[in-house]
Amino acid sequence: MGDCGAYSYIQADSPPVSNTEIIEYYAQSGFTHGVSVDHINTQQNDSWDDSRRCPSEISSRTEFTHKSAIEFIKLCRKNNVSFQPIGVIQSWGPRSAAGYARELVGNGYAYIGLGGLTMHSTSRIYDIVSEVRSKIPDDVCIHLFGFSRLGSLEAFNGLNITSFDSTSPLIQAFKDDVNNYFS
């Protein structure tokens, strides 16, 4: 899976790469799946469903990510890419995530990814995934970015999560003196 590495530019005003550039990179690298360029939203607040309350930085990051995903799938179609496009969703809560998910599916996505989850509680992540899953068809794949809740996987049974990623095992390999090798 090719990913644009949004955590590496989380403090930047905008991503340093375009969808056109990242599509070319994914194609040249031979990835089977490619992720749209996103801009991580680090905060959640259900009251922001009232757009008058949503801080401009939050709305601009989520809207950038949404528009980027729509552009990404259009460019993928135009370029007849060989990889599976994954549209990223950044949100401020379960309802906004579900709304963006419906729109991406409506634009032709068969695979979506939920980003910006790392810093949220397991119950909050569950609420987001559950709401998204309830609003999209069962055959649409869901990827969870930065999902390091390996001890909580069982709680997510029944939500039909296709995939997840985490750098936690890699970080643990370098930082833990005892539990640093898995076989």
Language model segments and positions:
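Non-catalytic, usually N-terminal nucleic-acid engagement modules in DNA/RNA processing proteins
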Residues: 1-77
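Glycine-rich phosphate/ribose-binding loops and adjacent secondary-structure elements
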Residues: 79-183
